[in-house]
Design a protein with these regions (language model features):
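Short, polar/acidic, helix-capping and beta-turn segments at strand->helix junctions
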Residues: 1-130
Length: 130
């Protein structure tokens, strides 16, 4: 059983907590980054384009472990920016991907830098493997 918990103020498109029954198979995914198949940064200087690539890569990670966006329980979304408008633009990409339709809880963070030169977005995820 997986359920969405929304006991606090109404969350925009995520849950305040996710509950998973013991014995459920989980996948803990490393950060999805905006690299193409050749290992090059996609959308240099463009956090929205990078978020799109990150979501595409996240879907591939999920597929590889036998899961999908509907089974994501938790994400942490890292954006190299101190501007809430930039964080919101990246979050809109996350919402548009369909990720927010599941029981997932999320944290959206503005950070100083990420691991690759030119990288502006990274998303880590935990998902149920049905």
């Amino acid at each position: 059983m997986i359920r969405r918990v929304t006991a606090l103020f109404p969350p925009p498109t995520y849950s305040h907590a996710s509950v998973v029954e013991a014995g459920t198979k989980l996948a803990f995914l490393a950060g999805s980054v905006p690299l193409d198949a050749e290992g090059r940064i996609v959308g240099e200087g463009d956090p929205v384009r990078q978020a799109e690539q990150v979501m595409a890569n996240l879907q591939e990670q999920l597929k590889a472990v036998g899961s999908d966006l509907a089974h994501v329980l938790h994400t942490e979304v890292y954006v190299v920016s101190g501007e809430t408008s930039v964080l919101s633009a990246v979050w809109e990409v996350v919402e548009a991907s369909g990720l927010s339709t599941g029981p997932h809880s999320s944290t959206l963070l503005g950070v100083a830098c990420l691991g690759y030169t030119g990288q502006l977005v990274e998303i880590t995820a935990t998902a149920v493997v049905p």
